[in-house]
Amino acid sequence: MNNEERSCAYIAHIESFLNSWYDLFHNEPQKQLFQAMEYSLLAGGKRLRPILAFEFCRMCGSPWETATPFAAAVEMIHTYSLIHDDLPCMDNDDYRRGRLTNHKVYGEAMAVLAGDALLTDAFSVASTVQLPNPAQFPLAIGVLSECAGSLGMVGGQVLDILSEQRECTEEEILAVQSRKTGALINAACTLGVIAGGGTEEQIAAAGRFAGLLGLAFQIRDDMLDQIGTKEELGKQTGTDSSKNTFVRLYGLKKCEALVDKYTQLAVEQLNIFQDTVFLCDLARKLTARRN
């Protein structure tokens, strides 16, 4: 299959899995909770993290579907983070992916609980994985929890909040972005390799790729906040203008060069894998996108 067909297959598969996971619970008395969870979880999006998990699994020589529980778990954690990021106590956003944010539809309390449930249920989903090497399951759960928690995404959000009232250095911005955005991309790539039965060297290479791609992806995101439109992005633009970003530090022109630099460095980390055409193409498309 060509690159477009592969991408569509990955997205269709994860959409089907996520749709079916909560079908079992619609008759539970707390059905409004599941409605709030599905409102954000099934709202579409790029499904970047599942795609990365599937592709790294495939590049390690295993059926890509093996990574499904890990791919779903990372996407659930990503969705919970978006719900919480949009809350009035965080970014206070009204729109996400072209429609009202979760708390605008279900209220703040239900939005918090929907995020909490998605985070917790992600580990239940991950526990259903069938690994080529079952002894690596503790490693996988450690990767998922570390990337999502205080040393990863949550830690990055904290650093972002603490930096709001002052000017930050490049190193400080790197510390925020490598955790806030890069950590879950790292989880997706690393878990894909583990699901595929990859080597320690491949796990390390996937982590390096993820760190560099995550940085390029976030810089591009910050650029789009300045040059994109609400129609393109599905949310209000200009909301990050007061935040410490590379765009604020260096301006758009230098950031464009940084995106190219980090994307190329990311692609170079894939030499240890075979058949990397799809992933190289994906990396370049992601960092040249308009939404």
Regions found by a protein language model. Name each.
Residues 1-291:
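All-alpha prenyltransferase/terpene-synthase fold signal
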